[in-house]
C-alpha cells in the first residue's frame, strides 16, 4: 500500500476508491474495502482509500476529543493488511470541510484520477453531509465518476460500526468488541515507573503509559490480556482503575501483572491485547483480602490464556 499525503501529488493510475475515517478498521470496514478491490479487479483498475489523519470533527469542533479505536499510526498499520494499492491520507482542513460533495468528488477525479467511488451504504460526505447517494450519482454523471453503493455488512442482526464497538469497550465487553473488530482490542504504550506496591504484595506490575492520548481506554476493571514486549507474547492480568484498596487518589492507572515473568521491562514498548473481562475493580477491607482475590484472578487468567 502506497501512502499519499500530499494533495498536490501527481495523479494515480485510474482507480476505484472509497471514503471514510476507518477508525479501528473493523470487519465492516474490511467488507467495504473488499468490495472496492472486487470492483477494481473486475474493471482492471487500482484500488484506493481516501481517509484522514485526524478525526474530521476535531477540525470542525476544536474542543472535540475523539475516543479512537486506533491511533493514526495503528490505523495505517491495519489498513496495510487490507492490501489496497493506495491510501490517500488527506489533511482534513477547514477549507476541505467546506467543500460540497460535488466539489470533493471533482477534486478526487481531477487531482487523483478516481474513476469509480464505492460508497458505504449509509455513508455521507461533503459540507454538512446533507446530500444523498442519488445526488452523488447525479454528480458522478457530470464528472465522469461511476458510483457504486456498497452492500451493508452485519453480524447476524447486529450492525457493526465504530460507535457500537466504542460502547462495548466502555462497558468492558472486550470479547464482543473483538468479534466486531476481527481482532482483540489493544493499547500500545511504554512501561513507566509506578509506586511498586504490587511487588511488595507478590504481584509485580508493569504500568502502561498509552502512546495516543485520544485512544479509548476500556471500562475500569480486571481483564485477562496478552502482553507483547520485544516480539514476545505473555499472558497477564490487567487492572484499569484507581486501586481503591491501596490508593485514595483519582488518577486512573493501567497495570498488568505478567504471568511467569520476571524481566526488567521499564521504559520498553508494550502492547496490551484485551481477551476477557474478569470482574469490576473493588475495594477490599484489608490488603490480605486483596491478595486472596488476586490469586483467584491469576488462576482464572491462567485457565483462559495458558
Task: For every predicted segment, state its role.
Residues 194-306:
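Phosphate/ribose-recognition catalytic cores of enzymes acting on nucleotide-derived substrates
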Amino acid at each position: 500500500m502506497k501512502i499519499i499525503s500530499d494533495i498536490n501529488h501527481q495523479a494515480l493510475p485510474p482507480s476505484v476508491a472509497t471514503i471514510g475515517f476507518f477508525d479501528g478498521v473493523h470487519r465492516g470496514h474490511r467488507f467495504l474495502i473488499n468490495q472496492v478491490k472486487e470492483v477494481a479487479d473486475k474493471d482492471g483498475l487500482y484500488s484506493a482509500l481516501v481517509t484522514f489523519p485526524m478525526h474530521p470533527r476535531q477540525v470542525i469542533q476544536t474542543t472535540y476529543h475523539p475516543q479512537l479505536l486506533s491511533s493514526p499510526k495503528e490505523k495505517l498499520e491495519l489498513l496495510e493488511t487490507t492490501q489496497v494499492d493506495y491510501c490517500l491520507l488527506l489533511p482534513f482542513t477547514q477549507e476541505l470541510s467546506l467543500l460540497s460533495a460535488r466539489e470533493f468528488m471533482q477534486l478526487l477525479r481531477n487531482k487523483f484520477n478516481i474513476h469509480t467511488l464505492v460508497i458505504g451504504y449509509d455513508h455521507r460526505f461533503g459540507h454538512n453531509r446533507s446530500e444523498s447517494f442519488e445526488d452523488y450519482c447525479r454528480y458522478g454523471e457530470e464528472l465522469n465518476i461511476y458510483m457504486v453503493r456498497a452492500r451493508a455488512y452485519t453480524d447476524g442482526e447486529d450492525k457493526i460500526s465504530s460507535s457500537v464497538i466504542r460502547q462495548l469497550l466502555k462497558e468492558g465487553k472486550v470479547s464482543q468488541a473483538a468479534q466486531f473488530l476481527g481482532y482483540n482490542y489493544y493499547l500500545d504504550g511504554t512501561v513507566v515507573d509506578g509506586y511498586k506496591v504490587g511487588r511488595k504484595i507478590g504481584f509485580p506490575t508493569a504500568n502502561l503509559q498509552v502512546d495516543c492520548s485520544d485512544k479509548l481506554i476500556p471500562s475500569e476493571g480486571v481483564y485477562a490480556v496478552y502482553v507483547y514486549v520485544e516480539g514476545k507474547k505473555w499472558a497477564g492480568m490487567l487492572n484499569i482503575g484507581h486501586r481503591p484498596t491501596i490508593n485514595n487518589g483519582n488518577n486512573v492507572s493501567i497495570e498488568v501483572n505478567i504471568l511467569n515473568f520476571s524481566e526488567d521491562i521499564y521504559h520498553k514498548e508494550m502492547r496490551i491485547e484485551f481477551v476477557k473481562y474478569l470482574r469490576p475493580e473493588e475495594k477490599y477491607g484489608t490488603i490480605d483480602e486483596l491478595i486472596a482475590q488476586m490469586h483467584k484472578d491469576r488462576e482464572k487468567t491462567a485457565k483462559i490464556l495458558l
